[in-house]
Regions:
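Hydrophobic transmembrane helix bundles of membrane-integrated enzymes that assemble
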Residues: 2-29, 36-244, 265, 285-368
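Long extracytoplasmic/lumenal interhelical loops at the membrane interface
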Residues: 245-301
Length: 369
């Protein structure tokens, strides 16, 4: 017991132990899933315990509480979201350095593509990890020219941003983290597509930083983020009124507003969420998928948690608008693209959101959530 305590006092060893436990729990043959599933639910909590016991990291329950709530609600509603806690742990480790958070994300994007593309193309990943994954089934990035081009643009913009921002160095456990995340997020083509857009926008911001004062647009960016979230629900509620402008917008969005209105008419918005099946369909085998990430989030986690997260999100963006409007831009992009993409606000699919949110929660000295 004393040996174990001495081991976990070292932050790097504690992180390594957690990665080993997580990997063991993840790489299990499908026939053993019913046996291993309870273990997979416990593993992230073991990770939090290991990190919490390290003397170099100080966290409080109020700081961890939002992520634990998201994790719990996700488990209850069938969301496999062990990655939430993994990202929380990474956020804790890099809580004092915002550059480290973004450095981790951009290195992750780069290595994610470099590592997973050839493995998926050769069929190695498909045969050993996740059989039903859409991206891997089609050869992932290397099969379709547009996906390969997207991967190439992502790599180049990521590296250029790292170079311009002088974020080219990363500790060894940071590389370990992104390698593990690459394995956990093999099937998240949507996440990579969104990160590409974020990379391009950040690249532009880096280039024009000397010529444009983003502080002048901080208030607009801050108001635009909650306004985007509110607009999604407003359009859903107004759709049955047969307003010409909303009907045209619904056609432009391939009927997504109509699907949201149908879901609201049939199910309202549950207080504690619904079990969303594969493909984000409410009814298995029937296409009534909620293609809006904002609307989907309220169904997956429930109205109560959505209001809580929305309030936290709004407070965070207000704080950022006063200190660093640079970071509001990718958050706004996520919200806007979240109107038509169904998983962009799901923390499992997008490490950018949880890292940015965590960074500002933890950088508030003495503040509670």
């Amino acid at each position: 017991m004393n040996i174990m305590i001495n081991l976990i006092k070292n932050k790097k060893i504690a992180i390594s132990l957690y990665y080993v436990i997580a990997m063991i729990s993840f790489f299990v043959p499908r026939q053993f899933v019913p046996i291993i599933y309870p273990i997979r639910l416990i593993v992230p909590l073991i990770g939090i315990l290991l990190i919490a016991l390290t003397p170099t990291v100080t966290i409080r329950f109020t700081q961890v509480f939002p992520f634990l709530i998201l994790y719990t609600f996700g488990v209850l509603n069938g969301v496999k979201n062990e990655e939430i806690v993994m990202l929380l742990i990474l956020a804790i480790l890099f809580k004092d350095d915002l550059n480290q958070l973004f450095k981790l994300n951009f290195w992750f994007i780069f290595l994610y593509i470099i590592i997973t593309s050839p493995l998926a193309t050769c069929g190695i990943i498909h045969n050993t990890v996740i059989e039903e994954t859409r991206g891997i089934r089609h050869g992932f990035f290397f099969t379709h020219p547009n996906q390969f081009g997207l991967a190439l643009v992502t790599c180049l913009t990521s590296l250029f941003y790292l170079y311009k921002a002088k974020l080219t160095k990363l500790p060894w456990y940071g590389f370990a983290a992104i390698l593990i995340l690459s394995i956990f997020l093999l099937n998240n083509y949507v996440m990579t597509r969104t990160n590409t857009l974020i990379c391009i926008i950040l690249l532009v911001l880096v280039l024009i930083d000397k010529f444009v004062d983003l502080n002048r647009f901080a208030k607009f960016l801050y108001l635009a983020i909650p306004a985007t979230i509110f607009l999604v629900f407003l359009l859903t509620f107004l759709y049955p009124l047969d307003i010409v402008l909303i009907n045209k917008l619904n056609e432009a969005l391939s009927g997504r507003i109509g699907l949201q209105a149908m879901a609201f008419e049939n199910y309202s918005i549950p207080l504690f969420g619904l079990n969303m099946h594969f493909g984000n369909n409410i009814r298995p085998g029937v296409y009534d998928a909620l293609d809006s990430a904002i609307y989907n989030f309220s169904y997956t986690y429930g109205l109560i948690l959505f209001v809580y997260v929305f309030t936290l999100f709004t407070k965070m963006t207000k704080k950022v608008s006063q200190s660093n409007p640079f970071i509001l831009v990718p958050i706004l992009v996520l919200c806007l693209t979240g109107i038509t993409e169904n998983v962009l606000l799901n923390f499992v699919y997008n490490p950018v959101i949880i890292l940015v949110c965590a960074s500002f929660i933890f950088k508030s000295k003495g503040a509670t959530v």
